[in-house]
Amino acid sequence: MNYIQTKCLFLYKFQALKTILSNEQLQLTIQRLSHQLIENHFPFTDTVFIGLQPRGVFLADRIVAAIQAIYPEKKLEYGVLDITFYRDDVHKELHVANQTTIKFNIENKNVVLIDDVLYTGRTIRAGMDALLDFGRAAKVELCVLIDRRF
């Protein structure tokens, strides 16, 4: 394979990334998700928010910050959950574990799991398995930025 064939193969395999949401659309979506959580869970007495490592944490940080900006007097319980060793593909390749930080009790609480994308549900299943190590929640809800469907 010469240089031209190699270059074409490289360009074929690695296409330019497509922008799904602009910065403005992303901010609007985060505000919309935050307001939906306020509508469903206010005054947050029995609700906790948990961002799934690694990419769900970025979304969770923004959602929790947006809610705190609207209700600065409310103390939201927010944690971060690493699901690395709960995944069904953990033995297939090397995975680096991230930190789990849950400094509150989830027993009989409404848990909102926050992640970036829902596709097959494997990440969410792993998150729910990992969550069981912290107690039995009354209810678990999912908040995602993008639902890829099928």
Question: What does each model-found stretch correspond to?
Answer:
Residues M1-F150:
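PRPP-associated nucleotide enzymes
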